[in-house]
Amino acid sequence: MRWFWIDRFSEFVSGKYATAVKCVSLADEVTDDYSPGRPYYPSSMIVEGMAQAGGLLIDQLNDFTGRVVLAKIQSSEFFFEALPGDQLDFRVELEDNLDVGSMVKGTVHRNGELQANINLIFAVLNDERFDKVQLFEPAEFCRMIRLLKLFEVGVNQDGTPILSLIHI
């Protein structure tokens, strides 16, 4: 299974916010299989999309060397379902960033209309217990970041481009 819950980033400002797009398709197995005969994109996958965008926003602050994991869904509110053919626009903002974890708040719009509010808490597994833990194979992680267009749209707060993952 491929772990893409967003299709691409449209904006990415280091340490501030990111916006991303997901085009819901009947070709997505989860859309058709989750509720046979009544296809829709599950809310849990929308949370996963927000977590993917937020986790990368956080991990980029450490040049993608951290082990950022979703720790808790602080709150989520969904107003209607996402259906095949809909475009979901994610916006995630970094609210609080500490060495051990971070908080993000986000919104999702479906075809321009507010579809969800989601607030997430992430943990950063950065102590010696996790030194040998690798969450992603480095080449596959680099491939994922490039496919999501992060380096095409990503900028630092001063407007300079975010550099590629040469160190991985």
Where are these regions (language model features)?
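N-terminal structural module
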Residues: 1-31
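Small-residue-enriched segments and motifs
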Residues: 4-7, 71, 90-92, 118
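Hydrophobic beta-sheet segments that form the core/acyl-binding groove
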Residues: 9, 75-111
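A structural microfeature
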Residues: 20, 116-118
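Compact, glycine-rich, soluble single-domain proteins
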Residues: 35-55, 70
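Hydrophobic beta-strand-centered segment that forms part of the acyl-chain substrate-binding groove
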Residues: 54-89, 123
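Surface-exposed, gly/pro-biased binding rims or lids
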Residues: 121-164
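Conserved small/polar residues in nucleotide/adenosyl-binding loops
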Residues: 166-168
